[in-house]
Swiss-Prot record:
Database matches in PANTHER family: PROLACTIN-RELEASING PEPTIDE (PTHR17206:SF1)
Keyword Magnesium: no
Protein name: Prolactin-releasing peptide
Record PTM: Amidation of C-terminus is required for receptor interaction.
A GO CC annotation given for this chain: extracellular region
InterPro entries named among the record's database cross-references: PrRP (IPR026194)
Cell compartments where the protein resides: Secreted
Top-rank taxon, per record: Eukaryota
Annotated positions of the Phenylalanine amide modification: F53
């Protein structure tokens, strides 16, 4: 019976200690944030503000994606040839006929 009481007392003390530690960490982070910080003050001086305002985090889908790359649909002209200005008109006429 004494062993059960000792276990309950230990669990109670452990729960109180964990609850106290969690509440102290939350209060500490709230003390740092002051509402009188003006982000325009930093931006006007060429300083990039970092923190709760101005920080941009990269989304997982924004980076380069692995896989096949699209190849541009144009080719380099050889021999110093210049592109024809009438070519877009001819292509449009061919598409209309089809």
């Amino acid at each position: 019976m004494k062993a059960v009481g000792a276990w309950l007392l230990c669990l109670l003390l452990l729960g109180l200690a964990l609850q106290g530690a969690a509440s102290r960490a939350h209060q500490h982070s709230m003390e740092i944030r002051t509402p009188d910080i003006n982000p325009a003050w930093y931006a006007g001086r060429g300083i990039r503000p970092v923190g709760r305002f101005g920080r941009r985090r990269a989304a997982p889908g924004d980076g380069p994606r692995p896989g096949p790359r699209r190849v541009p649909a144009c080719f380099r002209l050889e021999g110093g040839a210049e592109p024809s200005r009438a070519l877009p008109g001819r292509l449009t006429a061919q598409l209309v006929q089809e």
